[in-house]
Curated annotation (Swiss-Prot):
Signal peptide: none annotated. Belongs to the 4Fe4S bacterial-type ferredoxin family. RnfC subfamily. One of its GO terms (cellular component) is plasma membrane. The lineage of its organism: Bacteria, Pseudomonadati, Pseudomonadota, Gammaproteobacteria, Enterobacterales. Keywords: 4Fe-4S, Cell inner membrane, Cell membrane, Electron transport, Iron, Iron-sulfur, Membrane, Metal-binding, Repeat, Translocase, Transport. Residues 602-621, 660-718 are annotated as: Disordered. Residues 611-621 have a biased composition (Basic and acidic residues). [4Fe-4S] cluster 1 binds at residues 377, 380, 383, 426. This is Ion-translocating oxidoreductase complex subunit C. The gene is rsxC. It holds the Pfam family RnfC_N. It comes from Escherichia coli O9:H4 (strain HS). Binds 2 [4Fe-4S] clusters per subunit. Its EC number is 7.-.-.-.
Amino acid sequence: MLKLFSAFRKNKIWDFNGGIHPPEMKTQSNGTPLRQVPLAQRFVIPLKQHIGAEGELCVSVGDKVLRGQPLTRGRGKMLPVHAPTSGTVTAIAPHSTAHPSALAELSVIIDADGEDCWIPRDGWADYRTRSREELIERIHQFGVAGLGGAGFPTGVKLQGGGDKIETLIINAAECEPYITADDRLMQDCAAQVVEGIRILAHILQPREILIGIEDNKPQAISMLRAVLADSNDISLRVIPTKYPSGGAKQLTYILTGKQVPHGGRSSDIGVLMQNVGTAYAVKRAVIDGEPITERVVTLTGEAIARPGNVWARLGTPVRHLLNDAGFCPSADQMVIMGGPLMGFTLPWLDVPVVKITNCLLAPSANELGEPQEEQSCIRCSACADACPADLLPQQLYWFSKGQQHDKATTHNIADCIECGACAWVCPSNIPLVQYFRQEKAEIAAIRQEEKRAAEAKARFEARQARLEREKAARLERHKSAAVQPAAKDKDAIAAALARVKEKQAQATQPIVIKAGERPDNSAIIAAREARKAQARAKQAELQQTNDAATVADPRKTAVEAAIARAKARKLEQQQANAEPEQQVDPRKAAVEAAIARAKARKLEQQQANAKPEEQVDPRKAAVEAAIARAKARKLEQQQANAEPEEQVDPRKAAVEAAIARAKARKLEQQQANAEPEEQVDPRKAAVEAAIARAKARKLEQQQTNAEPEEQVDPRKAAVAAAIARAQAKKAAQQKVVNED
C-alpha cells in the first residue's frame, strides 16, 4: 500500500488557476521532418541576442571568418556570438533586429562564400571526466542561451543554481498555438535531446529530473519514451493541454506543486528549468564542439505554401526563409515573429533570425479574423478569470492608463508573463498586453533613473567626505608646521633661551663689596651718552629742516614784487577816477591809521634787530615804498572828500583811539620782551614799509583833491600827521639799511 501511495504521489499533476484553450493550429507544420534551408547571400548577426550586455568585438571589416568562429568575446554575463557560415566581414554597423519597433542594434554583416567551412571542432565525448566549472565555461563560450524565448545565458543560469537545485525540469510543453519547433525537434532528435539533459544533470546533480510535455504531442512522447526505456533517472510527465502550461511558473507548479514567490526565482525553491532546444544546443556544444549557429524555426500560416520546421542559420534574413517556404503575401500581409498570443508583428522582412526566434507566422487575411476597434472596459472580470498568474488585469489596465506606477507595482504587474490570455478573452478587444508591456518599460526606466540618482548621490557624498578628509589633513599639516619650528628657528630660540638663562644667572649672583674698590659704571655712562648724542643729532636735523624752509627763493621774490607793482598801479588808477562825492567812513580811517602806526613800530623794531649781514633787495624796497605812498595818498584823499556835515561820535572815536593805543603798547611790549636771537624776515619788513608808503601817498592825494569848502576833522589830521611821521622815520631807517 505504501508503494502505491508513493507511485501515486510521484506521478501527481497539479493544475493552475486560469488559462484558456485557443485553437492549436499545430498540424500545419508538425507533420513534415526538419529540413535545411539554402544559405543566404548575406547574414546579419546582432551582437546582442540574449538578456544582458553585448560582447566585445574581436573581428574587423575585411576579415575572413569560418563557421563557428567567435565574433565577440564573452566576459562575465556577456554571451558571445559566432559566425553562421564562412565568408568575409563586409560591415559592422547598426541594423534593424527582432524587435516590435525593429530597433537598430550593432551587427556584424557577413557575405557568405558558399563553402560553409567549420572551424576545427574539439568535442568532449567523455564530458563526465570534466569538472563542473569547465562544462559551464564551455557552454557559455559556445554561446548557448535559453531558446524557449527568454534568451537568458545558460552558463550563467547553471552557475547561479549551484548546489541547491533539487529538481531539473525540461520544458517540452510548447503550449502556444502554431508553434511546433520543439515538437519536431523531439521527434527527429530525441536521443540528442536526452543526451543534453544528462549533461545538465551531470552539472547540477539534482535529486530528480522531470520532462513536462503536453498530451497534444503523441509522436514526440513516443520517441522520448523509446529513448528513456532503459533509464530510471529521468521521468516523463504528460500534462493536459492548456494555455499557458509552458510558462515557467505554471509548469513548475504543475509538476511539483510549488509556487515561485513574488519577485523571486525558481531556484529559490530548488527548481531549475531548461528548454528542449537548449538541451539539444548543450549537447552539440559539449560533445560535438559546435557553437550555436542555427536553430529550429517553425514556418507556418496560410500565406506559406510549404509550412514546416527548418534549420535556420542565425543571421538569416526573414525574407529569405519565407521565400524558400513559398511565401505568397497578400495586400496587407503581416508576418509575426513568435506565436499569435505572445509574438509581435515585424515592421519589415529584412530583420535577421536570432537565438530566440522560434516561429514565423504568415497568416492569411481572414485566418486570424478582422482587427476590431478597442472599446471601453465593461468590468466583466473575464480577464481576471483567465489570468494564470492570479492577477487583476482590469485594475492593472486602469493603473497603466492613469500612469499610477506605484499602484501597478503594488498589484504585482512584474509577475505578468505577457501570455495574452486576458486580451484573448476580452470582449472589448482591449490590447491589455500592450498596456502592460508599456507600463513595465516605464517602471523600469523610472527605477533606472532612481538608480542613477542614487549612484550620483553616493558619488557626491563620497567626494564631500574625501574633501573633508583632505581639508582636515591640510589643517593638521598647517597646525603641525606652526607648532614645530624649522631648524634655524630652533637655533634662534635656543640662543634666546641661553641669553635669558645667562641674564638670570647674572641677576642671581650676589653683589660683593670690597674695601678700596670703586663701582664700574662705565657701561651705564656710555649708554647715557649714546642716547644724548642721538637726541642732539635728531634736534640738529630738525633745525636744519626748519632753516631750509626759511631760505628765500629769488624767483618767488621777483614774482611777489611784480604782483605788488601791478596792485599799486591799479590802486592809483582807481583813486584818480574816483568820484569827488565819494564819502569815507572816518571811523574806518582812524582804525586803519592806528593799524598803520602799529605796523610801523613793529617794522622799526624788526629792522633794528635784523642782522647786519642780511641784504635787502633794493627793487623790492622801492616797490614797498611806492605801495605805502599810494595807500597814504588814498587815505588823505578820502579824508579830504569826507562831507563836512558828517558828525563823528566822540565816544566811538575815543574808544577806537584807546584800542589803538592799547594795541600799540602791547606791540611795543612784545617787541621789547622779544629774545635778541629772534630774527625778523627782511622781506616781510620791506613789504610792509612799501605798503605804508603807498598808503601815505594815497592819503596826501586825497587831501589835495579835497574841495576847499569841505571842513577837515582835526582828529583825522592828527592821525594823518602821525602816519606821515611814522612813514618818514621808516623811510629814513630803510635808507640807512640800504646804504649799509
